């Protein structure tokens, strides 16, 4: 399970070190894709395969379903670590997520997200202000 919040730095060659706890769970190859709230989502191949199945079941007659499927699939790439446990974040993903120097890597259960520190700070401030309402909206899920 991926959990926790880690601050890291993107170097001048667009390399990002991934926490060792996360690397151990990913395996040799994994997927990174564009995700919601201007973040990137990284996941083991098994999680990606499940997500692909879910995307393939979206109703192609609905414009939003086609858009979401295209966005996630077109934004995806297979990634692997270098010897120092880093990944290279390609320009298109770096630009989408506004990744510059300061980056936050956050565990979200079956995967983890990569955020610009600025976007993460804004997101967590907004979410913290509304956390009680968010939790109440999820009462049916027995959390």
From Swiss-Prot:
It is found in: Cytoplasm, Nucleoid. The keyword Cytoplasm applies. InterPro entries: MraZ, MraZ_C, MraZ_dom, MraZ_N, MraZ_sf, SpoVT-AbrB_dom, SpoVT-AbrB_sf. Keywords: Cytoplasm, DNA-binding, Repeat, Transcription, Transcription regulation. The keyword Repeat applies. PANTHER family: TRANSCRIPTIONAL REGULATOR MRAZ. Belongs to the MraZ family. This is Transcriptional regulator MraZ. It comes from Leuconostoc mesenteroides subsp. mesenteroides (strain ATCC 8293 / DSM 20343 / BCRC 11652 / CCM 1803 / JCM 6124 / NCDO 523 / NBRC 100496 / NCIMB 8023 / NCTC 12954 / NRRL B-1118 / 37Y).
């Amino acid at each position: 399970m991926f959990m926790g919040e880690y601050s890291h730095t993107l170097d001048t060659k667009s390399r990002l070190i991934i926490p060792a706890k996360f690397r151990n769970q990913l395996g040799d190859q994994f997927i990174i894709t564009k995700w919601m709230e201007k973040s990137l989502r990284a996941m083991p191949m098994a999680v990606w395969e499940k997500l692909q199945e879910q995307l393939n079941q979206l109703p192609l007659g609905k414009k939003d379903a086609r858009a979401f499927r295209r966005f996630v699939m077109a934004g995806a790439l297979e990634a692997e670590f270098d010897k120092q446990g880093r990944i290279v974040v390609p320009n298109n993903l770096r630009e989408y997520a506004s990744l510059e120097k300061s980056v936050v890597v956050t565990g979200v259960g079956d995967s983890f997200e990569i955020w610009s520190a600025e976007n993460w700070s804004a997101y967590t401030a907004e979410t913290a202000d509304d956390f009680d309402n968010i939790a109440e909206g999820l009462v049916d899920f027995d959390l």
